[in-house]
Amino acid sequence: MSTIKFGTDGWRAIIADDFTVENVKRVAYATALWLKQNFENPSAVVGCDPRFAGPMFADVTTTVLASQGIKVFRAENMFISTPMISLGTVRTGASAGIIITASHNPPAYNGYKIKAFYGGPATPDDIEKVESQIPDTVSLELKTVTDYVTEGLVEYIDLEDMYVEHAEANFDIPAIRDSGLQWAYDAMYGAGQNVMRRLFPDITFLHADYNPSFDGQAPEPIQRNLQEFEQLIKLSEGEIASGLVTDGDADRIGLYDGDGNFVDSHHILLLLIHYMYKVKGEKGEVYSTFSCTSKIQKLCDAYGLNNTVTKIGFKYICDLIVNSGKQFMVGGEESGGIAVNGHIPERDGVWIGLMIWEFMAKSGRSLKDLVQEIYDVVGKFAVERYDLHVTEEKKQAIISRCKGGVDSFGHLKVTKTEDLDGFKFFFEDETWVMIRPSGTEPVLRVYAEAPSTAESFKILDIVKADLLK
């Protein structure tokens, strides 16, 4: 049997290659062992996003857990997002949540994510405990889901109703609906579509139907994957005020303004800090990962807020939210995963989108104007990224150079260096470049921040030429 390893956000593999019924049984059995070892009366919420064969793998997981005496709350809905599983875990008081999803990976993949009782990612320590108990083979006498329902070990629950009610209790949905603004939503054929249809039945929808192959495209809300949606907004000639995008399991966000300009996570984080502190009067800790814009620190300084920078990965943010003992306000990462106070300690693309739309509706200001409000405090900026495909030997040589200290890249003089997770080299005028190796492939991720997109790419080109010479 193949060795199963969990990555930073669950176990993912190609369907019918390593992601098979037999391997899902192995992982579910190890999950059951972990649950029984750590909880007196263990229970779990189980569901799946719209990926191919998701319901089958969710049923397999359900029956394995039930066969071990674990109570399973099985999502009865077809379009289940990761945040819906996390919310359901908290609301039912379950020991854990399990969702069959490969998030934004290409359509050939599926995956298995474990959520903790507090409604966020399970800790690396807990994941290691599950992983270490995955058997080479597993032989179980499994009954049907219906049999386990009859025995009281499986209970179907409506996570869609639960999520919609939670959203309606925390947002002024009528204010967004009746604002006179037109909205658009690209579901990328993913799990956010049903709750968005229920909350906003009259907005413009794209890729919001059942397509388990995602029309052949990875459901990742990055600009190059969103050209059809971008054109839809541009062709509306300002009639659409904002466009929201979520990924396959709806925990990551993409956003557009009314001119069809992509608004990245760096800007979204700043907008949330601005909205929550200046408009809603909230206070609390701000958490951002190492690859996020330095403007977060600048805005926090202006507002008297504390910003803690973490290693890259939402699990580090979740750990601070859950365990720091401090009042939390907002936290997020460059890749589109953002969490806010008043919800679960989990990334949630739909939730963050609703916050931005509510900000627009209640302020009567365009997204472009709200971004300008941020620029008025911290200055204009752009963060861009190159992925450099290099040999492992070259990658290690570059990392060794970074560890030894760098005085300059081309004519760019380094004034300060940080190495929390990768290497960030600061230049004059608050610009910087960050170099970080991928842990899974011979790729170097190189980020740059400058006052404009053109200047950021200029820095990237200079650094790239210096690194590859």
Protein language model annotation of sequence segments:
Residues 1, 110-237:
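Gly/Ser/Thr-enriched, mixed-charge loops and adjacent short helices
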Residues 47-50, 185-187, 257, 342, ...:
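Short glycine-centered, acidic/aromatic-flanked micro-motifs in structured strand/loop junctions
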Residues 77-79, 132-164, 258-332, 338-339:
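Proline/glycine-rich low-complexity loops and linkers
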Residues 98, 103, 111-130, 251-278, ...:
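Glycine-rich phosphate-binding loop of actin/hexokinase-like ATP-binding domains
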